[in-house]
């Protein structure tokens, strides 16, 4: 009987209930809300679902993640394995045809980076260091892979928070975007259908990633690992002779592309 009592006491002492805090409860509630948005409201379920469930798991005390799953994930990030793989998949899913046909659309992408500077200024105003603010600022561009990559370089201690913030922001774009669009456009403007100006040849689509990689990498060598993988994935897609590599990059590597 005494042995049974000792066993029960051991189970109680090792349980997570004794270490459970108000903060854990709040974050688990946040995770459950995100799970609802992902699966009930279908807000980017492939992206938000794993993040939300991970949020729940991470806030269960004494879960053993740091020695197990998290150790593998942290190694993949710190050794810069996951970000290039993510960019390989993104490149394989990207069609640069509209950009090649109408280079002026590049300005739209440049304008999107305004969010980076807004987030950067906000972080600086809140007292973060220049390096921390720069890592946080990338969240404003809604770019998860780049946020992770830059955080590992400039503010590794903020990596978890930055990754979750960036991917949550990306997942909630379908919720945030409609009211903003309605605020700045009319119904008639929203009904305009964009058409590609001309048909882009296969030769152009193959040459573009090669030339872009060489020129931009010479201009900014530090981004070669990410840019090179992005353009390699696109080359797999557009060459027409590497279907298996393209399919793997787009689908089998989805686990890397979707999770921070």
Regions found by a protein language model. Give the residues of each.
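N-terminal alpha-helical transmembrane segments of multi-pass membrane transport
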Residues: 1-68
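Structural signature of hydrophobic alpha-helical transmembrane segments
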Residues: 16-27, 71-86, 132-138, 167, ...
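Alpha-helical transmembrane segments of multipass membrane proteins
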Residues: 32-37, 89, 117, 121-122, ...
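Interfacial helix-loop-helix linkers and transmembrane-helix boundary segments
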Residues: 39-48, 70-73, 94-108, 242-250
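Re-entrant/interfacial helical elements at transmembrane boundaries that shape
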Residues: 49-55, 102, 134-138, 145-156, ...
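Alpha-helical membrane segments and immediately flanking helix-loop junctions
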Residues: 75, 79-80, 87-93, 108-118, ...
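Membrane-embedded hairpin module used as a gating/binding unit in multi-pass transport
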Residues: 165-242
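Residue-level detector of conserved catalytic or cofactor/ligand-binding positions
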Residues: 256-259
């Amino acid at each position: 009987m005494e042995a049974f009592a000792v066993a029960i006491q051991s189970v109680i002492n090792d349980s997570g209930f004794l270490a459970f805090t108000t903060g854990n409860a709040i974050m688990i509630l946040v995770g459950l809300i995100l799970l609802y948005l992902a699966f009930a409201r279908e807000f980017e379920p492939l992206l938000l679902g794993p993040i939300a469930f991970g949020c729940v798991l991470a806030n269960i005390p004494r879960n053993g993640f740091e020695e197990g799953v998290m150790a593998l994930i942290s190694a993949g990030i710190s050794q810069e394995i996951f970000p290039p793989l993510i960019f390989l998949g993104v490149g394989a899913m990207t069609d640069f045809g509209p950009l090649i046909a109408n280079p002026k659309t590049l300005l739209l992408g440049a304008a999107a980076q305004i969010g980076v500077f807004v987030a950067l200024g906000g972080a600086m105003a809140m007292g973060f260091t220049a390096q921390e603010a720069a890592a946080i600022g990338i969240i404003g561009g809604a770019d998860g892979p780049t946020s992770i990559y830059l955080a590992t370089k400039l503010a590794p201690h903020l990596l978890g928070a930055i990754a979750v913030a960036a991917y949550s922001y990306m997942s909630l774009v379908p919720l945030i975007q409609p009211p903003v669009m309605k605020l700045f456009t009319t119904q008639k403007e929203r009904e305009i259908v964009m058409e590609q100006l001309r048909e882009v040849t296969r030769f152009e689509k193959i040459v573009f990633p090669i030339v872009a990689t060489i020129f931009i990498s010479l201009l900014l060598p530090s981004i070669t690992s990410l840019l090179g993988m992005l353009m390699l994935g696109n080359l797999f897609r557009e060459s027409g002779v590497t279907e298996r590599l393209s399919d793997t990059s787009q689908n089998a590597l989805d686990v890397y592309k979707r999770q921070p």
